[in-house]
């Protein structure tokens, strides 16, 4: 989890540093990324098929090692299956399970990284569409072989990450972004 967070921080910093001051579109993207966070207060409400397709397309556009696109996404709307994967999921919420191959010429860390890039694209796209999002690793322990089979996951794949998408309630002090460590305590420069 810590490695994932460090990797995402590096990617975010790289995106921010590549923005020219005069580019309003880029400045808007940086502002959007800086304001995004993992939601905690979801509510009931349908997420349209069109939104899910946009979100999946954004994930599919992510970069990957050797352009291998080490991902398979399983969209779960079935309430019973969602309940077996995680608790307290509101009616209408959708889970996207990111899976990667068990066997590859690339190390499993690369496959997980590729999945994380795709999930981050989907995370941000869902938020741009006005939806709440949250990534999970802990519920992966619930995804045993039987459940993966019922999710129609490819046989040679394992679950890497879960993205929850849904309608959200108003942001409050509990549901807002968690405090960040000061950036200067997480970055060093070598001139």
What kind of feature is each model-predicted range?
Residues 1-4:
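Positively charged n-region of N-terminal signal peptides that target proteins for export
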Residues 8-13, 18-191:
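Acidic, surface-exposed loops and disordered segments
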């Amino acid at each position: 989890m810590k490695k994932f967070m460090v990797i995402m921080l590096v990617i975010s910093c790289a995106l921010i540093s590549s923005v020219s001051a005069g580019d309003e579109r880029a400045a808007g993207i940086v502002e959007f990324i800086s304001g995004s966070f993992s939601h905690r207060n979801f509510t009931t409400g349908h997420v349209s098929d069109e939104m899910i397709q946009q979100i999946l397309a954004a994930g599919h556009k992510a970069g990957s090692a050797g352009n291998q696109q080490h991902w398979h996404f399983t969209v779960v709307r079935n309430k019973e299956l969602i309940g077996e994967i995680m608790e307290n999921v509101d009616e209408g919420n959708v889970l996207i399970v990111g899976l990667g191959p068990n066997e590859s010429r690339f190390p499993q860390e690369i496959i997980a990284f590729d999945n994380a890039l795709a999930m981050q694209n989907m995370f941000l796209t869902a938020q741009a569409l006005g939806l709440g999002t949250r990534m999970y690793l802990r519920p992966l322990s619930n995804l045993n072989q039987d459940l993966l089979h019922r999710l129609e996951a490819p046989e040679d794949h394992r679950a890497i990450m879960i993205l929850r998408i849904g309608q959200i309630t108003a942001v409050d002090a509990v549901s807002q972004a968690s405090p960040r460590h000061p950036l200067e305590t997480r970055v060093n420069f070598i001139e």
